[in-house]
Amino acid sequence: MVLIFGKENCPYTAAARADYARRDVDVEYIDVKQSRAYMEQMLGYSSGHRRVPVIVEDGKVTIGFGGT
């Protein structure tokens, strides 16, 4: 499963979600604006970087999304 931390109004988050959906990858989407705990969880993965999306796939963390 892939974790995507993002914000609903972020076009890069939307693009990442669409890309994984197109490839039929199981994704858990977490909107960091919904809870301080979600934001803290994202910051833990991203070493404090506040840029979204933060994608966690097979233990690898990617900050941002540039498409495929």
Q: Predicted segments — roles?
A:
Residues 7, 12, 41-42, 48, ...:
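Accessory recognition modules or surfaces
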Residues 57-68:
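Non-catalytic, surface beta->alpha helical segment in thiol-disulfide oxidoreductase systems
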Residues 1-27:
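Local sequence-structure signature of Cys/Sec-based thiol-disulfide redox active-site neighborhoods
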Residues 31-49:
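Thioredoxin-like thiol-disulfide oxidoreductase module
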